[in-house]
Design a protein with these regions (language model features):
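Active-site nucleophile elbow and catalytic-triad environment of alpha/beta-hydrolase enzymes
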Residues: 41-55, 61
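Catalytic histidine neighborhood in serine/cysteine hydrolases
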Residues: 80-103
Length: 120
């Protein structure tokens, strides 16, 4: 979830995993930090910028991106952007009602099962 998606995206760039699931991913740490600290030069302060929007272009494994529109920590638009940039095969689970902590309801479980069943 969120910060873990930076690590997962980084590790997935040069490996052939059966599949990757990113829950509430962010495009970069700079983009995410600017939401809370718009007047601070966060790019100068961060050692690892977690440029996920660049790294996801190198991911060749099937990917499922999940994000809720009501997320108040990582903007929903970042999850959408990550999905747009991701290579095929790619799948999404976007909801109108979930916030940063997604509810593992019947719809989400069905999506996860479907994604996992279709992996090689």
């Amino acid at each position: 979830e969120s910060l873990g998606t930076g690590v997962a995206t980084h590790l997935s760039q040069n490996r052939n995993f059966a599949g990757i699931i990113l829950e509430t991913p962010f495009t970069s740490m700079i983009d995410a930090a600017k939401k809370f600290y718009p007047y601070i030069p966060v790019g100068l302060l961060l050692k690892d910028k977690f440029e996920n929007k660049n790294k996801i272009k190198n991911v060749k494994s099937p990917i499922l991106i999940m994000h809720g529109e009501k997320d108040q920590i990582v903007p929903f638009e970042m999850g959408q952007k990550m999905f747009e940039i991701a290579n095929e095969p790619k799948y999404s689970y976007f909801t109108k009602y979930d916030n940063h902590m997604m509810e593992y309801d019947e719809n989400l479980i069905k999506t996860l099962n479907s994604f996992l069943i279709n992996l090689n």
